Structures are given as C-alpha cells and as structure tokens.
C-alpha cells in the first residue's frame, strides 16, 4: 500500500522497506500467520509511517477487517489520516483504516471495538514512563485475541530488555526476538537505531493474569497465570499513549507526555 502523501523526513522510505523485510522474519520465527482478515492495532503510532507495510505484510490481499492507529497527539494523527486514507487495497476489498487521538495508559474509551489479532508498538519508550507503559502493555494484552500476537520494536538494547521483562511479568509469553542487522543508526543518542530489535509475544495458553487497572500489582498478578477467561468482542478499548522523539524516523511520545521537541 502506497502513502497518499510523501513521508516527512529523508530516510523513512528506506526504514519502512527494511521493516517490511524484518516483520515477515519475526512472524516466521514466532510460528504465526495472520488470519485471512486480521484486525490490527497500532499503539502510540505517531505519524503511523509503518501503516502501509503492516497492511502489506499482515493483509497482503487487502482483506484487513480493521486497522486502527492511536496516538496522543492531534497533529501526528492528522498527518496519519492524510497519508493513509481508507482505499481499495486489492482483491480482498477495502480495508477499514482509522486513526484516533487518545492515551492507552489512562482509563477511558474510544468506543466499542473488536479484539485484535495483531497489536504493534513501534519504538516503544518504556524507560521514560515505566508505570505508564506497564499500564499500556496491560491494556494491550487485554485487547489481544487468544492466538494473536503483540509485537514491539525498540531503539535501544537496554530499553528493549526492560519492555520485554515488563511484558513477561504481565503474563505474556515471548515467542520471537530478532536483532535488525540493517537498522539505521541515529545520531541524537548513543546506541540508538531504527527498529533495532523486534520482539513478538502471545498470551499464555490459559491467559495472563491481569490485575484491574489502578489496583496495586501483587506477586501473583506479576507472574502467575490463571484459568482462561474469554476476551469479549466489542470491548471499549483504551486510548494510546505517545513515545519519544526521533531523528528522521516516525516520532513517538512517552505514554504521558512529550519528551523533547519532535522533528
């Protein structure tokens, strides 16, 4: 799927093309194939530059049932809407593409939505707001269909490990973790590069134990699974948070506030 308007910064086209090669490797490593008409959630999506490649990889016949991107910032969501209008994508029909402003780390809803087959968080920002990202990941896991996959990419090795540990404590099972050998180095921070690591997670067979939002986490909530419970369709989905600014890559914000000036 081609963008309706050009990307905002030099280098993004090549970054997205490389992500399009990395994602299929991750899906194969995770031993997962998307359903014929997947529902896809892109959390803390910023300008959502990766929308086209997500739809190309996960719904190559244009049969995505629903694609939703959520971010805290109005300007970035406005740009995403302009770049990725809903349009015929192939013999499968028309993908329903939507972008919303919201913060998934906080209580609140953006309306009744289905559960999702694939949830993506690109360039997660765990170490800027660990508590907020803990809440965001918890909400993401409650929105994930049984058998679905949650994927994250990271700028930094250490931040990737922190996010991975958080998801494991929440009850997610790690199914793949790939370094990106062609990751483009960024110069605004040491050791930072575009989509440096890709990790995929699933719900455990009997479902993660998730404490209600706002309740103090206990050891059981952090580590112990409980018997399976249904994840109902039509749940009111929480709103997504932002991530950290980037140099020449799609900007993200932390889940609670802007970190620096985006450019």
Predicted regions and their residues:
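Class I SAM-dependent methyltransferase Rossmann-like catalytic core
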Residues: 1-32
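Glycine-rich SAM-binding Motif I of class I
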Residues: 48-52
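Class I SAM-dependent methyltransferase SAM/SAH-binding core
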Residues: 53-98, 103
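A short acidic, Gly/Pro-enriched loop at the edge of an enzyme's catalytic core
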Residues: 109-119
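A short SAM/SAH-binding and catalytic strip from SAM-dependent methyltransferases
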Residues: 117-131
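A short glycine-rich, Lys/Arg-flanked "PGG" loop and its adjoining helix->strand segment in the class I
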Residues: 133-146
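Conserved beta-strand signature within the Rossmann-like core of class I S-adenosyl-L-methionine
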Residues: 147-154
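Class I S-adenosyl-L-methionine
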Residues: 169-224, 257
């Amino acid at each position: 799927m081609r963008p309706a308007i050009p990307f905002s910064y030099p280098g993004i086209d090549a970054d997205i093309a490389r992500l399009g090669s990395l994602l299929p490797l991750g899906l194969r490593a995770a031993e997962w194939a998307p359903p014929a008409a997947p529902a896809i959630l892109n959390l803390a999506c910023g300008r959502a530059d990766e929308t086209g490649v997500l739809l190309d990889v996960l719904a190559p016949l244009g049969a995505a049932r629903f694609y939703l991107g959520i971010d805290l910032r109005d300007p970035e969501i406005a740009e995403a809407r302009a770049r990725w209008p809903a349009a015929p994508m192939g013999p499968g029909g028309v993908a329903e593409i939507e972008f919303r402003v919201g913060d998934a780390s906080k209580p609140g809803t953006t309306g009744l939505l289905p559960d999702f087959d694939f949830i993506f968080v690109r360039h997660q920002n765990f170490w800027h707001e660990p508590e907020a990202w803990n809440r965001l990941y918890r909400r993401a896991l409650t929105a994930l269909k049984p058998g679905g996959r949650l994927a994250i990419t990271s700028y930094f090795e250490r931040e990737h490990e922190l996010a991975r540990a958080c998801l494991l404590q929440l009850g997610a099972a790690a199914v793949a973790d790939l370094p990106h050998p062609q990751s483009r180095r960024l110069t605004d921070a040491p050791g930072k590069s575009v989509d440096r690591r890709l990790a995929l997670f699933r719900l455990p067979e009997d479902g993660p134990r998730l404490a209600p939002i706002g309740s103090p986490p206990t050891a059981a909530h952090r580590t112990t699974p409980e018997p399976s419970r249904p994840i109902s369709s039509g749940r009111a989905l929480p709103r997504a948070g932002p991530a950290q600014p980037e140099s020449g890559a799609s900007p993200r914000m932390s889940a609670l506030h802007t970190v620096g000036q985006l450019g």
